[in-house]
């Protein structure tokens, strides 16, 4: 499901429905969505915008460079280690929720929605 093929299949359905933007749950899904857009004769981002998630390695090197959401992995890891160390030392398990703010990494796969509606053959 979180593969290029899965992204291609899901995006194909969205493109046929007239979507002008697709936000994907992973970067590989987004690459599949870009492939589907191109196969439908669409330009990314002129006709449709695509956003990935995770800022995987080399996403700045794709064509177009992929706009993605970057998670604060280091901060999440530090918090997890601190919680685990506390539990190992006998601290009570906390019910506190931790929130981490992701970052949008704007690159070349997004633009304003097209002004004129498109017609697919």
What are these regions (language model features)?
Residues 1-16:
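Structural motif
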Residues 14-121:
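Flexible loop/turn connectors
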């Amino acid at each position: 499901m979180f593969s290029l093929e899965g992204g291609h299949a899901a995006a194909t359905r969205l493109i046929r429905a007239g979507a002008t933007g697709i936000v994907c749950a992973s970067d590989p899904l987004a690459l599949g969505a870009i492939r589907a857009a191109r196969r439908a004769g669409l330009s990314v981002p002129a006709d449709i915008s695509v956003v990935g998630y995770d800022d995987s390695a080399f996403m700045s090197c794709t064509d177009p460079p992929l706009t993605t959401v970057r998670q604060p992995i280091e901060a999440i890891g530090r918090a997890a280690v601190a919680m685990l160390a506390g539990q190992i030392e006998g601290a009570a398990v906390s019910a506190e929720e931790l929130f981490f703010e992701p970052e949008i990494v704007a690159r070349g796969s997004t633009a304003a929605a097209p002004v004129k509606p498109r017609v697919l053959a």
